[in-house]
Amino acid sequence: LNGAGIVHDTEVAMVGRTSEDVGAVLGTGEFGAARETGEVVNEAISRGAEKNIGLGQAVGEYLLEKNFPYNDMSLLTSAVRLNVPVTVHVAVGTDIVHIHPSADGAAIGKTTYQDFKIFCRIVSDLEGGAYLNIGSAVLLPEIFLKALTVARNLGHTVNNFTTANFD
């Protein structure tokens, strides 16, 4: 996922839907300024940094801990329950949670870097498999290419695979 994915997943867990009409609030300076989403995501990231875990796991665990009413609809809570890694690749400044007072750039960087390392391990086992890029035509394809390079440079055979971009 990219950073927007965790924002939307958090909103779904909290209230059962995403919550903002961008067009209605962009001109007023309110875009991305919802207090609750920023506080929840940034607290989850800070805790994840303290625990040395990835951003996806950190948010999933935090949502479960808070027992939000729609956690059953959350990709991240489901991933934690099933012990399936969901990696989150953030570009600082691109997500609404980065403009909140609780945003901690060091924690964001630490947790998203943990996820990059996890993603590299996953890509190193991609031989004969498929990579589906969903929702990011710019950032995530670049992350994939870097992870593929890391895997190959570490001696993993990753030549026979299929990719598809859904954006």
Where are these regions (language model features)?
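Glycine-rich anion-binding loop/nest that anchors nucleotide
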Residues: 1, 87-93, 115, 120-143, ...
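Ligand-binding beta-strand-loop-alpha-helix segment within the catalytic cores
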Residues: 8, 21-83, 87-88
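Short acidic, glycine/serine/threonine-rich loops at helix termini
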Residues: 9-15, 98-102, 143-146
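Active-site rim beta-loop-alpha module in soluble metabolic enzymes
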Residues: 83, 87-101, 105
